[in-house]
A protein has these predicted regions:
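Active-site substrate-recognition loop segments, prototypically the cytochrome P450 B′-helix/B-C loop
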Residues: 84, 88
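Detector for methionine-enriched segments
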Residues: 1-5, 19, 23, 133, ...
Length: 200
């Protein structure tokens, strides 16, 4: 059962009373949409992978890489089966679903591939990103929240770097991925979280 309306009014009143006027104005502004724009897919991804961090065993242990192939994701110490046609786990918490859109679990997958992993790691990464692009329609849901975008873009760039030329040589995939990343970046630029006045 939800919170009574009188409690909601009090909650919002107390919250707004502590905010700076610029924060209130920024929060009241609607999400700004950006149109699709052409992007030069011949550009090579930036080299931002850091092996000491991205291939760290303790970092990788936070995720069950083998379960990803079954569409099961271990995030914040909880495993959920995800419907990749919707890219959400309805029974999971909002925080868990937010974490789903970070794609952090793909960094150790790409690191495993770079260390001599199998073609299945590459195919799984491609399947996850392509199903995400198909399911997460612009600009709806947690997928398009500025915070999830800011983390996902970095994680995708790290993965592209770790997978290397084998992805760059897949023109169709790189075209789709680069176009998606560019749109996410433009959306992030247009929808910065000015109402927070801080980094997360």
């Amino acid at each position: 059962m939800g919170m009574p309306m009188s409690n909601k009014v009090l909650l919002y009143t107390r919250t707004v009373a502590r905010m700076k006027p610029s924060m209130v104005v920024a929060r009241l502004q609607r999400t700004k949409s950006v149109s699709e724009a052409p992007v030069d897919v011949s550009l090579r991804p930036l080299g931002i992978a850091c092996g000491a961090l991205d291939a760290d065993a303790a970092y990788a242990a936070r995720f069950d890489l083998d379960a990803l192939a079954r569409d099961e994701f271990l995030l914040i110490n909880e495993t959920q089966k995800v419907d990749l046609t919707r890219w959400e786990a309805p029974e999971a918490s909002h925080l868990w679903n937010f974490n789903l859109h970070y794609f952090e679990y793909c960094v150790p997958l790409a690191a495993r591939y770079a260390a001599g992993g199998s073609r299945e790691d590459l195919d799984l990464f491609k399947r996850l990103t392509l199903t995400w692009m198909a399911a997460c329609k612009y600009p709806r849901g947690d997928a398009w929240h500025p915070y999830t975008i800011s983390l996902r873009l970095v994680n995708w760039l790290v993965c592209l770097n770790l997978f290397g030329d084998v992805l760059v040589d897949d023109g169709d995939f790189m075209c789709a991925m680069t176009a998606s990343m560019y749109r996410q970046y433009r959306h992030l630029l247009a929808n910065q979280e000015r109402h927070l006045l801080a980094n997360h």
